[in-house]
Amino acid sequence: VLSGTDKSNIKAAWDKVGAHAGEYGAEALERTFTSFPTTKTYFPHFDLSHGSAQVKAHGKKVADALTNAVGHLDDLPGAMSALSDLHAHKLRVDPVNFKLLSHCLLVTLACHHPNDFTPAVHASLDKFLATVSTVLTSKYR
């Protein structure tokens, strides 16, 4: 459960991401594909090379979904229901991949905002991404 402090930390951190959200989403995806090559199996039709338009576009989708989630911290299941259905029933993404991408997103945010990435902010963002991952995998059952 996200505390009031967590919610404040998440909103403040995401405000700093701002216009860079799509760029950071793409960077986190590239980091995921490089660090965990098995994640590439879900994107056989993508050009996965550095800077590819397809990775940038999907990174923006990821970032937009997270921006939506940040705006609905009190109702993540409702805000992410359609994405949960898509990933569970159509795409059939292995749930572990959400954790891998979450880790890579935290690394990306820490690299770009080292002074703002305090232990408290790190913990809040980690809880947020874990909650988002749980919501996205809730329809798998």
Curated annotation (Swiss-Prot):
Stored Pfam families: Globin
One Gene Ontology cellular component annotation held by this UniProt entry: haptoglobin-hemoglobin complex
GO molecular function: haptoglobin binding; heme binding; iron ion binding; organic acid binding; oxygen binding; oxygen carrier activity; peroxidase activity
Location of Phosphoserine modifications: S3, S35, S49, S102, S124, S138
Name this polypeptide is given: Hemoglobin subunit alpha
Keywords: Acetylation, Heme, Iron, Metal-binding, Oxygen transport, Phosphoprotein, Transport
Lineage per the UniProt record: Eukaryota, Metazoa, Chordata, Craniata, Vertebrata
UniProt modified residues of type Phosphothreonine: T108, T134, T137
Assembly with partners or alone: Heterotetramer of two alpha chains and two beta chains.
Free-text function comment from the UniProt entry: Involved in oxygen transport from the lung to the various peripheral tissues.
Source organism superkingdom: Eukaryota
Binding of heme b, residues: H87
Modified residues (N6-succinyllysine): K7, K11, K16, K40
Similarity remark: Belongs to the globin family.
